[in-house]
């Protein structure tokens, strides 16, 4: 059994609830433990994961959040920089599944967040589990 930290950027409560439920269900189905940490926004997710990874309390991480395109350039910054930060941590050997949705509208986000539909929270958790298995295989 491994311990995972689900780090959620809580902005759209109903969508986040679905993403977290999907991630938690996928982790528990494999016999893993899950804890949830909430941060203000998607840009804070990589930093929170980096801090949590320092103490070795968790074996892997699931990044959760929803970024919906608005009328300004802010969407591109948040979507790109949060993904870049997560990728950089993954390249450093931290097992992270990225479940931060970047969509054009709320309907697309709902389709992807709902565990009964596309279940992107569950997919992100499964990705984190897969990366943790690779860590074990390669002794990282």
Curated annotation (Swiss-Prot):
Positions with a binding annotation for (2S)-2-hydroxy-3-oxobutyl phosphate: 71-72, 112
GO molecular function, one term: 6,7-dimethyl-8-ribityllumazine synthase activity
NCBIfam families the UniProt entry points to: lumazine-synth
UniProt entry tagged with the keyword Transmembrane helix: no
Functional note: Catalyzes the formation of 6,7-dimethyl-8-ribityllumazine by condensation of 5-amino-6-(D-ribitylamino)uracil with 3,4-dihydroxy-2-butanone 4-phosphate. This is the penultimate step in the biosynthesis of riboflavin.
Catalytic reaction(s) noted: (2S)-2-hydroxy-3-oxobutyl phosphate + 5-amino-6-(D-ribitylamino)uracil = 6,7-dimethyl-8-(1-D-ribityl)lumazine + phosphate + 2 H2O + H(+)
Positions that bind 5-amino-6-(D-ribitylamino)uracil: 11, 42-44, 66-68, 98
Keyword Transmembrane: no
Name by which UniProt lists this protein: 6,7-dimethyl-8-ribityllumazine synthase
Upper classification of the organism: Bacteria, Pseudomonadati, Pseudomonadota, Alphaproteobacteria, Sphingomonadales
């Amino acid at each position: 059994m491994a311990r995972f930290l689900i780090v959620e950027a809580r902005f759209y409560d109903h969508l986040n609830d679905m993403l977290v439920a999907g991630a938690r269900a996928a982790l528990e189905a494999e016999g893993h433990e899950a804890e949830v940490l909430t941060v203000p926004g998607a840009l804070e997710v990589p930093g929170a994961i980096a801090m949590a990874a320092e103490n070795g309390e968790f074996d892997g991480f699931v990044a959760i959040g929803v970024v919906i395109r608005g009328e300004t350039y802010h969407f591109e910054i948040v979507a790109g920089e949060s993904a870049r930060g997560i990728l950089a941590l993954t390249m450093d050997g931290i097992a992270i599944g990225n479940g931060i949705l970047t969509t054009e509208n709320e309907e697309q986000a709902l389709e992807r967040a709902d565990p009964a539909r596309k279940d992107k929270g569950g997919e992100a958790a499964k990705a984190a589990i897969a990366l943790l298995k690779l860590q074990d295989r390669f002794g990282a």
